[in-house]
Design a protein with these regions (language model features):
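ATP-dependent adenylation/nucleotidyltransferase module used to activate substrates
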Residues: 1-155, 174-176, 182
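AMP-forming adenylation/ATP pyrophosphatase catalytic core
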Residues: 11, 123-368
Length: 368
């Protein structure tokens, strides 16, 4: 096949491209420049699209003896990922920019360009597995559970999955991937992993939000409406947060308090005891299917597990898909700190079967 390999400059994408070539594919490499200010990003930065990353991507392609190009996707990334990130926080929601990037940049814009240029598939260094099942392609967790990225890939949908290659999905550990790079003499074999939001180079998410959304003083109140502190912008807080509250009045029982919610209209943050974060029902919208629409799993006929943050816990549940794309989940065990805006992925075993965006999480009344 004619394969377009996305090279980020890291070890994972370099090894994935090498494996694709060694599998007999005709591989061309591309580095996606996602930052409009790449030259300002210093070497060793924690952010994306540093000069060092672009240089490492070019070096990897040269060592693998494959053609290399740089595609400027900064405008698309800014509009669909960064602006979405800011807009979601303006609404008091908790977005996952990696999900949006995969949806709009890596597996939409990149795939569209690849298809127009006659490529048969796109290859990346993501940790996930694409398996051909009885009814078509399926997305499964990677064998290396610690690095599994199926959660942020489920938004792709089945059609996009038909034209991707994830060579690293079968590896049991990241150390094995680094060993593959070392065997091939790739110098990025020891390059550290990146865990932060890629466009926030210093890792200071609150500072980034403040610089773009500004500051506005507001109240922090308890569940009875009593003021217990102040803040400089309700958008800076997410459900379940405990650190950084700086409450002026301790709770009567002396217990720690957590963010229970925000009211963006009144710029108010509500805090309370940890047990008030517990929920047993979730409503999500804009469902993306990775299975057949009539799959009985989506009508509550099988126990599934839910994941609502990257590398988060798996929660047993039953789910019900409605005709308008709304997904209702009834949790078989309560969970906590579920925020609107997060991506909800439904798994049957290690297979992802549906993704949707959380609108509401709540505690059902007894007998409901």
């Amino acid at each position: 096949m004619k394969v377009l390999a996305a090279l980020s400059g890291g070890v994972d994408s370099a090894v994935a491209a090498a494996l694709a070539k060694e599998a007999g594919h005709d591989v061309t490499a591309v580095h996606m420049a996602l930052s409009a200010n790449q030259a300002q990003n210093r070497c060793g930065s924690r952010g994306c699209c540093t000069v060092e990353d672009a240089s490492d991507a070019r070096l990897a392609a040269s060592m693998l003896d494959i053609p290399f190009y740089v595609w400027d996707m900064a405008e698309t990334f800014e509009e669909t990922v960064v602006e979405d990130f800011l807009n979601e926080y303006r609404k008091g929601r908790t977005p996952n920019p990696c999900v949006r990037c995969n949806e709009f940049v890596k597996f939409k814009e990149l795939a569209t360009r690849a298809d127009a240029l006659g490529f048969d598939a796109v290859c990346t260094g993501h940790y996930a597995r694409v398996i051909t099942g009885p009814a078509g392609v399926e997305l499964h967790r990677a064998k290396c559970i610690e690095k599994d990225q199926s959660y942020v890939l489920a938004v792709m949908g089945r059609e996009a999955l038909e034209k991707v290659i994830f060579p690293l999905g079968e590896y049991e550990s990241k150390s094995q991937v680094r060993a593959e790079a070392e065997q091939r003499g790739l110098p990025m074999s020891a390059k550290p992993d990146s865990y932060d939001i890629c466009f926030i180079a210093d890792g200071d998410t609150r500072g980034f939000l403040r610089s773009h959304l500004g500051s506005k003083a507001g109240k922090i109140v308890d569940t009875e409406g009593k003021e217990v502190g102040t803040h400089s912008g309700a958008y800076q807080y997410t459900i379940g947060q405990r650190k950084g509250l700086n409450l002026g009045r301790p709770a009567a029982d002396g217990r720690p308090r957590y963010v229970l919610g925000t009211d963006m209209k009144t710029n108010t943050v509500v805090v309370g005891a940890s047990e008030l974060l517990s929920v047993d029902a979730i409503t999500a919208t804009d469902a993306v299917l990775l299975t057949e629409p009539d799959d009985p799993t989506l009508s509550g006929q099988a126990e599934v597990t839910l994941q609502y943050r990257a590398h988060g816990q798996q929660v047993p549940a039953k789910v019900y898909l409605e005709a308008d794309g709304t997904l209702r989940a009834e949790l078989l065990e309560p969970t906590r700190a579920v925020a609107s805006g997060q991506s909800l992925v439904v798994y049957l075993g290690d297979r992802a079967i549906c993704e949707a965006t959380i609108e509401e999480a709540f505690r059902q009344e007894k007998g409901q």
